[in-house]
């Protein structure tokens, strides 16, 4: 494992000038994130990377699902928003460090979002009960927000309810720089528990067996 000194010296020539290479390897972090997700029982099936040409803001997205739900109906969407201002500010602080092996200052963060998706629900749960239960499953390591959207396919149709289940953590660049993945590991562990909680109840929310009774 490389040290802080190795990483900084690798981008700092002998004359003291600084090359245009980032201190934080975001692509490497995303690769490690996918590897960790697999270790916690998720299957990764897609990845996207977007860059705004003007602001240089980046968005990394990873689509995965728990290995118990290969046939659906639950998917988990990870998104990492890379703010160039936070990244450049952190790099400036690292370059000011006299002892390159010490821990850099904290406070520079990227938001890492976890979003669960399910099909529209025929028998949606009570939102207050669901939010309370999921809050207990996610715990303090993964605060989860629950909301819902009702849509009408046509004016004569009954509403279809879709759940919005989102968790957000602040990814401190100090932890990324020091290869400290404890917070990410805790979040992925909680994500697996939330995914299994939803999977156990999804069939009842989606069940359409009663439709046969309405057919004449």
Residue ranges and their predicted role:
Residues 57-59, 71-75, 105-111, 160-166:
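A general secondary-structure signal for short beta-strands and their flanking turns/coil
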Residues 73-145:
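C-terminal basic regulatory modules in eukaryotic proteins
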Residues 17-21, 33-100:
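N-terminal interaction modules that seed assembly of large macromolecular complexes
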Residues 22, 64-66, 116-118, 169-176:
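Short beta-strand-to-loop capping motifs
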Residues 16-23, 27, 120, 177, ...:
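Short, charged/polar micro-motifs that form catalytic or ligand-binding hotspots
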Residues 109, 122-216:
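Glycine-rich, aromatic-bearing surface loops/beta-hairpins
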Residues 17-19, 31-35, 132-136, 190:
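Eukaryotic endomembrane contact-site and trafficking scaffolds
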Residues 2-20:
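A short, surface-exposed helix-loop junction/capping segment
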């Amino acid at each position: 494992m490389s040290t802080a000194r190795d990483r900084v010296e690798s981008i700092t020539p002998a004359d003291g000038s600084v090359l245009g290479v980032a201190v934080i390897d975001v692509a490497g972090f995303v690769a490690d994130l996918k590897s960790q997700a697999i270790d916690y029982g998720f299957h990764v099936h897609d990845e996207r990377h977007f860059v705004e040409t003007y602001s240089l803001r980046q968005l990394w997205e990873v689509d995965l699902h728990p290995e118990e739900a290969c046939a659906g109906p639950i998917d988990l969407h990870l998104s990492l928003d890379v703010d160039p201002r936070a990244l450049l500010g952190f790099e400036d602080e690292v370059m000011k460090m006299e002892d390159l092996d010490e821990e850099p200052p904290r406070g520079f963060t990227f938001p890492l979002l976890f979003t669960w998706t399910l099909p529209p629900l025929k028998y949606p749960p009570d939102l207050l009960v669901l939010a309370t239960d999921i809050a207990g499953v996610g715990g303090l390591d993964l605060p989860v927000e629950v909301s819902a959207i009702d849509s009408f396919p046509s004016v004569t149709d009954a509403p279809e309810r879709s759940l919005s289940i989102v968790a957000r953590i602040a990814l401190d660049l100090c932890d990324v720089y020091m290869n400290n993945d404890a917070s990410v590991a805790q979040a992925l562990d909680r994500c697996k528990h939330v995914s299994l909680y939803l999977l156990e109840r999804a069939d009842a929310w989606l069940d359409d067996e009663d439709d046969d009774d309405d057919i004449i």
